Amino acid sequence: MTDDKNNKETTLEKEKVGVYICYCGGNISDHVDVETVRKKIKRIPGVVVARTNMFICSDSGQEMIIEDLNNGSIDRIVVASCSPSLHEMTFRGAVSRANMNPYLYEHVNIREQVSWVHHGEAATDKATRLVAAAVAKAKLLKPLEPIQVKALQHATVIGGGVAGLRAAIDLSDRGFEVMLIEKSPFLGGQVAHLDQIAPFSEKAADLISSLSRLVLQDTSIKIHTRSVVEKFEGYIGNFKLGVKTYPQSVEDQEKLERFDVSDNKRGEFIPFVGVCPGPESSDTEAFTVETGAIILATGFKSYTPRPGEYGYAEFEEVVTLPELIRVLAENETNGNLLKVNGREIRSVALIHCAGSRQIPGIHPEDESGNLNEYCSRTCCSATLQTANIIRKAYPGTRVFEFYRDIRTYGRGQEALYEQASRNKVVFLRFEAENLPKITRNGSSNDFPLRVKVRDVLTFGEEIEVPADLVVLATGMEPNNISELVEMMKLPVGADRFLLEVHPKLRPVELSLAGILLAGTCQAPMDIGEACNAASSAAVKVATLLARGQVELDPFIAEVDLDKCTGTGACVEACLYEGALNLVAIGADGQTVHR
């Protein structure tokens, strides 16, 4: 602590509280009369400053607080704004820059707890009472120092796809020991099932092989495939994971035997050389990992259409885009017509948004009642690239694209759309309320399927397209990591992807310090975005652990046994496994759990 800070804190006076109330751009002020709250709070004894600001978290808002602290007007502050999970660190930093102890600041959530759930006078009244309570607490605040604990110079990456590999490499480059845990037998994740990557048609094999090679050759990276995390405890800098590695199954062995390195034939698991980490144990092994930080790179799974959705599982001629991509990769020769399973394909219908941008009442729910209302972001580019490949390699095969919107964002992506138009791909646009309908063609000598659609581009005219093959551009879904979510108490969004603290200010951090996100476990994204997120997470880990110690908040929770009713709600809500436990005690001649 600096001398200036010591001098300020040894002369702390009571009743010099500054209160700062945020409009939050209308998020708060649309329902809370912020000026009324300010006027009422200003009348509380001890409040010497009461100000409002459109965005307290902005640089100008923080400077306002720092200026009041520096000129001695106040010695404690109360900020009434959005959730402290978003901006508590922001305001602690502002207080520290004014050479004041950051724990002389109290935060009030009047957005999520007030304006988003109350309206009118009720909202204003509740906000006033919450801020008044915070003022009373602020008067009792004392300067505190964070707890310093040793941080292990080790990181664990869970997930061996593109994001996990990138994170492991970046961590190793920064001098950390890394453990990479992957549940499948091989590295590479979903990208290992691709052939060419949009928009520049790089080979997926080249990308995965280069990343895998760096990981496999790095002695500071320990790889465990067929492994899952089964136990978790600890805190930032000192986590402990229980990991179990499963033996190679007979089914896996059969899939391995179908992979011939000499002629590079594709197997079900290994689409190319360079993603197998080496010999696997034939026994189940359990071990413990002590690690300083964890990066979650658990990836995504491709959407599986519901039976009957666009004719899927009803007509054998209806396949998914990943399935077609594998067929195209395995076709060794070009020709006038594309061939699939020995059949000549004269006409292909590509249907966008299968499993994405779903609408309640229109699209079918899964067995858990879920809908994917989000855009998967990569499907349009992948579909357009596939259309271009077909038109170039098989000029006799006609390609029709059925879409709601074409979303080719990012560098080079729009060129795919322009190229498809030049390649004479036919585009038919439908509305969500009128999805394309797939029917069997009655004539055995004609095309097997017909796709019927009301085309927006021709003012709703009903058009029928004959098709030998219908391809569904399936989107992304979060992998099933419910056990990890429950074990680590990870926050999950409405879309079932893991939820970051703040999409702009803390985009790769979770509410539990020391656990970070990388790649598509967080949201649909392309390979470049996944690698960027992985590198960001690696840099954040390096920043947290580089000094060899981490700072913990100097707050110690105590259980008031006289008030405890033994419900266990606190144990369930606590983010830190093992920090709280119900124990049997004697009370009034009986044994109770508290």
Regions found by a protein language model. Give the residues of each.
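Residues forming the flavin
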Residues: 1-594
